Amino acid sequence: MEEFQGYLELDRFRQHDFLYPLIFREYIYALAHDHGLNRVILLENVTYDNKSSLLIVKRLITRMYQQNHLMISANDSNQNKFLGYNKNLYSQIISEGFAIIAEIPFSLRLIFSLEGSQIVRSYNLRSIHSIFPFLEDKFPHLNYVADVLIPYPIHLEILVQTLRYRVKDASSLHLLRFFLHEYSNGNILIILNKSISIFSKSNSRLLLFLYNSYICEYESVFLFLRNQSNHLRLTSSGVLFERIYLHRKMEDLVEVFVNDFQGILCFLKDPFIHYVRYQGKSILASKDTPLLMNKWKYYLVSLWQCHFFVWSRPGRIYINQLSKHSLDFLGYFSSVPLNPSMVRSQMLENSFIINNAPKKLDTIVTIIPLIGSLAKAKFCNALGHPISKPTWADLSDFDIINRFVRICKNLSHYYSGSSKKKGMYRIKYILRLSCVKTLARKHKSTIRAFLKRLGSELFEEFFTEEEEFLSLIFPRTSFTLRRLYRGRVWYLDIICMNGLANHE
C-alpha cells in the first residue's frame, strides 16, 4: 500500500497553491494575449529551488513578461458592458489569464516530478509519431484491439470537481465556476459533436486545460489500477504527463480505488495489455482472449460512470481481431494483416514446403478524407479535381508558390510513415496543379502557356528535403532511390496533427 501511495502522491507542500493573488498581476494578462508565447520558456526555467512559493512564481512571470513585450489594446466596438467594462474583451482576457495561472503550478510540478524520477526530458517523446514505432514493435504480437472513444463530461461542474482534486484554492475554483456559467449563458450542459468547446475559439485555452485535467485524472487512475493488477510500474507513462503538462494523481484517490476495485483487479491481470491515446480516442490491445478485453471494457464504463459521472455505453468500445481490423488513428489506417509466404527447402532427396505468415504493421494514408479536407480548403472540388485558390490571387508569385510548397511539404512530412506512397502522389498532384491554376488566374493566362514559360522549375519547388537529399546521392531512375522513397520514416519533431490530416 505504501509503494502505491508513493507512486500517486503529490508533495504535500505543493498541494495548497493559492492562485487568486496572481489574478491581480497585470503581467498575466499581457502573457495571455501574447499568442506567440512558447510555454517551453516555463519548462526551461528549472533552476529554481524545488520548494516553490508564490514569490518564485511571481518572479518567473516577471521574467517571462520581460521576454515578451506586448501591449494590450482595449479598443473594441462592442458596447455590451460587463462590470463597467467591455464584456467580451475583458472576460476573455481574465479567462485566458486564469488559464495561464492554473498551468504554472502544474508545469512546475511536472518539472520536479521528472527530476525526482530521473527521467530524461526529451522533446522527442512528445512527438505523436513516437506512437507508431511502439505500435510496430508491439502490435504484430497481439491478437485483439479495442477502439475506445473517451466520453466527454456533459456538465461543466464535472470539470470543476475534477480540478478540485489538484487545486486547493477555493477562491480560484469559485472564479472558474463564474467564468463557465458566464460563457455558457445559463446553459451548463456541454453539447459535444466535434469539440468540447461551447465557447469561442479565443477561449479554447481554458477549456483545453480543463479537458486535459479531466483526461489526466482518468488516466492516472486507469494506469494506477493497471499497474497494480500486474504488480509492475509502467516506465512509459511519464511521456503522457509530459505531453499534456500535468502531473500524477493525488494520494486521496488511492484509498478510494484500492478499496472499491480490489475485488475486480484479480480478473484483470494481463501483462500484455497496451494502452495508447491521442486526444479523445484511445486504443487497448491485448494478446489474451476476448473475454479479458470485455472485462476491461465494462470496467472502463463503470469507472467513467461511477467516479467521473460521465455517461458512457459499452457500445462505444469496439473489440475486434487485430488481423482483420483497421484502426483509424492519427490520420492513418493501421492494420496487422497476415502476409503468407511460401519457402521451398530441400534436404538430400526430400523437399519441404514451408508456409509462413508473418505479421507486420501497415500504415496507409486515408486518401478520401484527406481529399475531403483539401476540398473544404478550396484546393479541389469534391471529386478531387484541382481548382484555383482565388483568395490567394492577390499575393505575389513567391508567396503563392511558398504557401503551396509549405502545405505540400508539411503533408509529406506528416505522412512519411505510410506503407504505400502512391496515395500521396495524388495529393501532391492536386496541390501542384492548384498552384499552377492560381498563378495562371492571377496573370490571366492559360495553364499550358504558364507551364511552358516556367518549365520544370516550378515543380522542383515541391520536392521535400528528403527527396532533394536523396536525388543528389542517387540517380533519379535508380532502384535504390525508389526503394528509399517507399520506406517508412517516423519523425520525432511532430507534436500535433496536421490541420488537413485531422478529419474529425
Swiss-Prot record:
In the record, biological process GO terms are:
mRNA processing; RNA splicing; tRNA processing
Protein name, as recorded: Maturase K
A Pfam family reported for this protein in Swiss-Prot or TrEMBL:
MatK_N
HAMAP family assigned: MatK
Q: What does this protein do?
A: Usually encoded in the trnK tRNA gene intron. Probably assists in splicing its own and other chloroplast group II introns.
Q: Which UniProt keywords apply?
A: Chloroplast, mRNA processing, Plastid, RNA-binding, tRNA processing
Q: Which residues form the signal peptide?
A: none
Q: Where does it localize? A: Plastid, Chloroplast
Tell me the organism's taxonomic lineage. Eukaryota, Viridiplantae, Streptophyta, Embryophyta, Tracheophyta
Name the InterPro entries for this protein.
Domain_X, Maturase_MatK, Maturase_MatK_N
Q: Name one GO molecular function term.
A: RNA binding
What family is reported?
Answer: Belongs to the intron maturase 2 family. MatK subfamily.
Tell me which GO cellular component terms the UniProt record holds.
chloroplast
Q: Which PANTHER family match?
A: MATURASE K (PTHR34811:SF1)
Q: Which organism is it from?
A: Betula papyrifera
